[in-house]
Amino acid sequence: MASASSVSLMLLVAAAMASAASAQLSATFYDTSCPNALSTIKSAVTAAVNSEPRMGASLVRLHFHDCFVQGCDASVLLSGQEQNAGPNAGSLRGFNVVDNIKTQVEAICSQTVSCADILAVAARDSVVALGGPSWTVLLGRRDSTTANESQANTDLPAPSSSLAELIGNFSRKGLDVTDMVALSGAHTIGQAQCQNFRDRLYNETNIDSSFATALKANCPRPTGSGDSNLAPLDTTTPNAFDSAYYTNLLSNKGLLHSDQVLFNGGSTDNTVRNFSSNTAAFNSAFTAAMVKMGNISPLTGTQGQIRLNCSKVN
């Protein structure tokens, strides 16, 4: 007969296995409950990105900023809270597109598809709409009832981050160095505000001089002057999802400090070189990293809720 301690251990193992099973996401989650969910999301995203290519980057960023703060739970969509954090305030975009998608999905499947899953699918569809690779999005996330502004301030990478800080930041989310470099490649699309690259323009030496001169015209040195002026993160092909971001780094044309540190004599130099010359390798690493990121601490089963309106709890 088993001892009490061994029975307790067996129960703990069983509970852990059940917990792991419940946390598993599935590519077929909505096949029965809402079979047209993915096609509805894709149509809305494609239309939004075709209308404004920058929106693709904004939707990818929403998913990233969601997953890095208490997991992929759509907490970033709740009004206030995380939206007021330093890395998000005045720069997060795409809420109107998400709201439009949610309205369309609710019309065909009431309270079935989570806002967290909408973000994950919209990120994939945005990349595809801009010519990038596709991947299978695992589904079944549920929406949080809380958000965490303080965690958004501490856990989201800053544009001034050092390489060591970036590696540590991603590692704490279960993402390795290759994941970090690959996910940074999302900066092949989108734009950044002058206030986030001004210091690099005027105070750093590992920047192409012609590149810096061109940017200074729209980003004056005085703080407070032109802070919100925009520049593309990838000046070569700003609206195409490709590997030009890495090629730019090889020429010291990274816009943000946190971009150029990936190629500055450090441990990630070879990965940048590889992704620059081998688009297939970048695409493979990027899609794998997006799946891993999308699996950060999801709410599943009966956890959380399926919000009716992405900006507020039910």
From Swiss-Prot:
Q: Give residue numbers for the site Transition state stabilizer.
A: R61
Cystines in this chain: C34-C109, C67-C72, C115-C310, C194-C219
| Any one of the GO CC terms | extracellular region
List the GO molecular function terms.
heme binding; lactoperoxidase activity; metal ion binding
* Cofactor(s) needed: Ca(2+); heme b
Pyrrolidone carboxylic acid is found on Q24
Q: Which GO terms describe its biological process?
A: hydrogen peroxide catabolic process; response to oxidative stress
**PROSITE patterns named in the record:** PEROXIDASE_1, PEROXIDASE_2, PEROXIDASE_4
Q: Which residues bind substrate?
A: P157
* Enzymatic reactions: 2 a phenolic donor + H2O2 = 2 a phenolic radical donor + 2 H2O
Record function comment: Removal of H(2)O(2), oxidation of toxic reductants, biosynthesis and degradation of lignin, suberization, auxin catabolism, response to environmental stresses such as wounding, pathogen attack and oxidative stress. These functions might be dependent on each isozyme/isoform in each plant tissue.
The family assignment reads: Belongs to the peroxidase family. Classical plant (class III) peroxidase subfamily.
Record's protein name: Peroxidase 2
The root-end lineage is:
Eukaryota, Viridiplantae, Streptophyta, Embryophyta, Tracheophyta
